[in-house]
């Protein structure tokens, strides 16, 4: 395909302003820019300072998501997202006109699936539209079946298991957990991600065919989805994109030097990396305390990411003993990909967010699963029972993990026959992840086919 035709094809990305949503979309944008397309990413003005976009082929525009004083705080997720949609639509219209005037008309808007009526919005603006999903195909199938009324979330009393098309039998504890908090209709909004997919020009999922073969096939029987993952920096996978070593976005400042220096001094496969994601996870004091002592009682070295707002939950006794035994390094943030790919890392204790799951799987790191909410329990089900690359810490009667169980699960992953089997499986999936993104791999071919259709349309 001629480079000139590619460079005249313009894709604009509209991410949802959260790190877990922006990172995979940024990776997709970088890959398309490397393949020759013109790319513009629309950033919320409030977070532009967190972005590190050095690729000259990626352009940025800013819009503000500020609410006017008269807006107040909408009473529901639907009302909130409705206001966001109105503001985004109005400002996108101006941005699209600006691009046309400058000689770079936009051919396609790739929009985070959380925005309501995304495809309708794109078509109203006279541009093709493609929702971008940041969860797995399996979770997409669960949410969609719930939208159809085939199951309820939270599940009804007495329900012990659920059977759904393409999905392994799910126990009650494998279903998504929605802690609604401010927005009691949050789950309804998640279901509404599927409201206009029949009108979409493309639908993108951050997964790959061999990872979710049956689940992707089932979703494809409903809509024309495209698997384009795993979306992590190329230097950790296929190495096609020169110097693509990070996601280019960090909402928190990481002390890279001290993390890597500490890991460099440890033996290969001897360290547990623990992190529960980029969003405040609201673990109770008792829960944090049990995790902390479980890490210490495992007798393995550990590096634990505890964001500043959660650090006060760590007891002085734990901190003193961890320092005395020189077993742990507690940091407010760290470069996760660099850490997971470090030779000293033997396992990853994770909340099972989809990005973290994909990163660990792609780097061949077995997991200790501690799912908290949203799609995480379903991801943990796949980590343990489907891909067989981790163990799940059981929850006690009070809804809190116990330190002994935490320590035992760490030992299961780090040593013995179970650990050997999990590491072997993790390395197998690492190879398949690389294969998907290599030239001619399943996701690489899917991306090339998408580009060809877009350019010729």
UniProtKB/Swiss-Prot annotation:
One example of a Gene Ontology biological process annotation: saponin biosynthetic process
EC number(s) from the headed UniProt entry: 2.4.1.-
InterPro entries per UniProt: UDP_glucos_trans
GO molecular function terms listed in the Swiss-Prot or TrEMBL record: quercetin 3-O-glucosyltransferase activity; quercetin 7-O-glucosyltransferase activity; UDP-glycosyltransferase activity
Keyword Transferase carried by entry: yes
Primary enzyme class: transferase
Pathway: Secondary metabolite biosynthesis; terpenoid biosynthesis
Residues bound to UDP-alpha-D-glucose: 134, 336, 351, 354-356, 359, 375-376
Catalysed reaction, written as an equation: (20S)-protopanaxadiol + UDP-alpha-D-glucose = (20S)-ginsenoside Rh2 + UDP + H(+)
Residues that, per the record, bind an anthocyanidin: 21
Database matches in SUPFAM superfamilies: UDP-Glycosyltransferase/glycogen phosphorylase
Active site residues of this protein: 21, 112
Alphabetic keyword roster: Isoprene biosynthesis, Transferase
Keyword Signal in annotation: no
Entry function: Component of the triterpene saponins (e.g. PPD-type ginsenosides) biosynthetic pathway. Glycosyltransferase that catalyzes the biosynthesis of ginsenoside Rh2 from protopanaxadiol (PPD).
Family affiliation: Belongs to the UDP-glycosyltransferase family.
Record protein name field: UDP-glucosyltransferase 45
Native species: Panax ginseng
């Amino acid at each position: 395909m001629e480079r000139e035709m590619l460079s005249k094809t313009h894709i604009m990305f509209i991410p949802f302003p959260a790190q877990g949503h922006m990172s995979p979309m940024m990776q997709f944008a970088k890959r398309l820019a490397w393949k020759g397309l013109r790319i513009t990413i629309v950033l919320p003005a409030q977070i532009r300072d967190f972005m590190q976009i050095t690729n000259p082929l990626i352009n940025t525009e800013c819009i503000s998501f500020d609410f006017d004083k008269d807006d107040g705080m909408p009473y529901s997720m639907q009302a909130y997202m409705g206001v966001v949609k109105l503001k985004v639509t109005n400002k996108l219209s101006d941005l699209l006109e600006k691009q046309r005037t400058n000689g770079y008309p936009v051919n396609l808007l790739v929009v985070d699936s959380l925005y309501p009526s995304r495809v309708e919005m794109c078509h109203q603006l006279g541009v093709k539209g493609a929702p971008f999903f940041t969860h797995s195909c399996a979770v997409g199938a669960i949410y969609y079946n719930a939208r159809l009324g085939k199951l309820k979330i939270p599940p009804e009393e007495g329900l012990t298991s659920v059977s759904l098309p393409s999905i392994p039998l799910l126990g009650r504890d494998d279903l998504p957990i929605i802690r609604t908090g401010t927005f009691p209709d949050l789950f309804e909004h998640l279901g509404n991600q599927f409201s206009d997919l029949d009108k979409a020009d493309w639908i993108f999922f951050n997964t790959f065919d061999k990872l979710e073969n049956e689940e992707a096939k089932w979703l494809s029987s409903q809509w024309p989805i495209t698997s384009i993952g795993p979306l992590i920096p190329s230097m950790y996978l296929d190495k096609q994109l020169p110097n693509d070593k990070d996601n280019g976005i960090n909402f928190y400042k990481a002390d890279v030097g001290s993390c890597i220096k500490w890991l460099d001094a440890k033996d290969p496969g001897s360290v547990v990396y623990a992190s529960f994601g980029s969003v405040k996870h609201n673990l109770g004091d008792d829960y944090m305390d049990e995790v902390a002592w479980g890490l210490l009682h495992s007798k393995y070295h550990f590096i634990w990411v505890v964001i500043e707002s959660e650090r006060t939950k760590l007891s002085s006794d734990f901190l003193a003993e961890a320092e005395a035994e020189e077993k742990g390094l507690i940091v407010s943030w760290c470069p996760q990909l660099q850490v997971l790919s470090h030779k000293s890392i033997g396992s990853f204790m994770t909340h099972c967010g989809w990005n973290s799951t994909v990163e660990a799987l792609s780097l061949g790191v077995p997991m200790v699963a501690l799912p908290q909410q949203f799609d995480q329990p379903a991801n943990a089900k796949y980590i343990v029972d489907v891909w067989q690359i981790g163990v799940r810490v059981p929850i006690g009667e009070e809804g809190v993990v116990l330190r002994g169980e935490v320590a035992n699960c760490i030992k299961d992953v780090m040593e013995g026959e179970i650990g050997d089997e999990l590491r072997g499986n993790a390395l197998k999936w690492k190879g398949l992840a690389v294969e998907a993104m290599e030239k001619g791999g399943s996701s690489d071919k899917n991306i090339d086919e998408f580009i060809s259709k877009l350019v010729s349309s």
